[in-house]
Amino acid sequence: MSASSHHDLHSKLSLGGILVTLGIIYGDIGTSPLYVMKSIIGLHTIKPEVVLGGISAIFWTLTLQTTLKYVLITLSADNHGEGGIFALYALVKRTKVKWLIIPAIIGGSALLADGIITPPVSVASAVEGVRTYYPDINTVPIVIAILVVLFTIQQFGTKLVGKFFAPMMMIWFAMLAILGILQITQNTSVLCAVNPYYAYKLLSIHPDGFYVLGFVFLCTTGAEALYSDMGHCGRKNIRISWIFVKIALLLNYFGQGAYLIKHAGHTLKSINANNGNPFYLVMPEWFQPFGIVISTMAAVIASQALISGSFTLINEAMRLNFWPKVKIKYPTDLKGQIYIPSINWLLLAGCIGIVLHFEESSKMEAAYGLAIVLCMIMTTILLTYFMILKRISWFIIAPLILLYLVIEFSFLIANLDKFPHGGYVTLIIASALTFIMSIWYTAKKISKNYTKIVKIQTYKKVLAELSVDLSIPKYATHLVYMTNANRVDEIEEKVMYSILQKRPKRADLYWFIHINITNEPYKKEYKVTEIIKNDLFRIDFNLGFREPTKINLMFKEVIKDMVAKGEVDITSRYESLSKNNIIGDFKFVLSEKFLSNDSFMHWHEKLVMNTYFFFKKMSLSEEQAFGLDSSSVKVEKFPMVLHAPEKIELCRIK
């Protein structure tokens, strides 16, 4: 599927598309009623003005932050139909503003950290509903068991279970709306919470003061997922389905508020000592067992969306040189559905660690929100440059960006209050991920700066002579090198050293393959240049940042196409094999760098490069990353010299 057809497919508005959107996009933001009002009220006595203030703050947060910023503005910043912070960075990279790499890396790391905390919070909040019937039950083993099953089935793909996501989430949102309406009809005064005055007043009357915004923010943590998963569903489908989702969410929040106002003067524990969660309290007693099951399934779906999103994020990070190469599997034929084993088990370990550390959802909520608000701020910064790129007037850009920086920094300051209570956990995770991405990107940049590029023109004559020099044993019929040289008439000096000096490698045909990762997510193009007639070819692959680099398969397709067009003869040049039309052998030569002992580095370069090579040992080898058959690959080691030593003065004695 081409990039344009992929974009056209997802830009279409359809009932099926809307249903799929419900199943994929809204799991995170859709399950927030499980814990938001519970967090705002906490252990304090229920006061009508606090309840109205909380509902009002939720209403305006969902309106300004989720609806206006993400659904209306940010979704317009699509990269050929794809969304997410890395897709946005790939889009604004063309502004040539180098420091934009910083918000991209911080935002991506924060989003990954959120993928570790969200599944435990959602699943734990849902499972704790069983305490209504079994007050002394330890929910930790149940939560861990659900998470283990969820992460284990990832390797088989989610095509089958994904069919149930849409109808299940439809039931979930319908349940939210109906439960809310039942309570609102009994206390319509709660509707006055649409007045923003109550939200403003909340900051002065809530026991936690300004920091209550940290709990209010939990209602919009899933907004970033709307943007990240745009490529799966399309902008129009998200915008239309959001109308239904927002109404269902608000009805439930207002319904919880109506119930709480009726119980003013009490605490949540005094209303129900076993399960003081207003989400479950609004349910009729006979419906609660069904509500617990539906909530748990919705929480699992929310977790699934974040796991899939994390795989996509890491895949993009690898293409943009932010992350070490790791093994990627394609469990189904669905486009864009990938499985990364190492990330899957790391996420599971992180989720289990969170559950064991905090044990209860109320304690996990303290760790929740800090990372994602950082991601939102980074998105706002990148969005500013997208608007500049689109030549939008500064009279529009300035007030919009200022508004969202004020809102998001307010949420950030409020969330910082959670730091000693658990917020440090996600911040440590996000910092570790930022460190890895920064090291990998910087090391790649240093490596590129110290790679010597030479003109192929200088070597044309000797290459042509080498291929027919019978005094040198033939190394391969076809000799293939990967190159990072962007220009067709250039090549790395180490490649020519490998062919001519290390051990002269005679071949009938030489091939240079260059991969260019494009800003378009699903581009698959190639260009063939004949540098020396019947001796040297260069193939340039232009691949989207979401496309897998299956070089072995793609190279075969290119060769097949060239043979069909009579552009190249790949039969063996050995007489006995040639007359029987036997295809010649192909040999790939890959270079593996190591840090030379002759390198003189500054301390920061030493830290970066040593850490880079440490991570590289644990990452995928070049042959695996390119999808090459190891039997046809030769790996050569080349020393990487940074700041070559000055000439050493030696005195010869007799």
From Swiss-Prot:
Main subcellular location of this protein, as a coarse class: membrane
UniProt subcellular location: Cell inner membrane
Transmembrane annotation, as ranges: 17-37, 40-60, 71-91, 99-119, 137-157, 164-184, 202-222, 240-260, 281-301, 338-358, 369-389, 394-414, 423-443
Keyword Cell inner membrane attributed: yes
Source organism of this protein record: Flavobacterium psychrophilum (strain ATCC 49511 / DSM 21280 / CIP 103535 / JIP02/86)
Topology in the lipid bilayer: Multi-pass membrane protein
GO molecular function, one term: potassium ion transmembrane transporter activity
One GO cellular component, as annotated: plasma membrane
Keyword Cell membrane included in the entry's annotation: yes
Function statement: Transport of potassium into the cell. Likely operates as a K(+):H(+) symporter.
Entry-linked PANTHER family: K+ POTASSIUM TRANSPORTER, OSMOTIC STRESS POTASSIUM TRANSPORTER
Family the UniProt entry places it in: Belongs to the HAK/KUP transporter (TC 2.A.72) family.
Name by which UniProt lists this protein: Probable potassium transport system protein Kup
Pfam families in the cross-refs: K_trans, K_trans_C
Reactions listed under catalytic activity: K(+)(in) + H(+)(in) = K(+)(out) + H(+)(out)
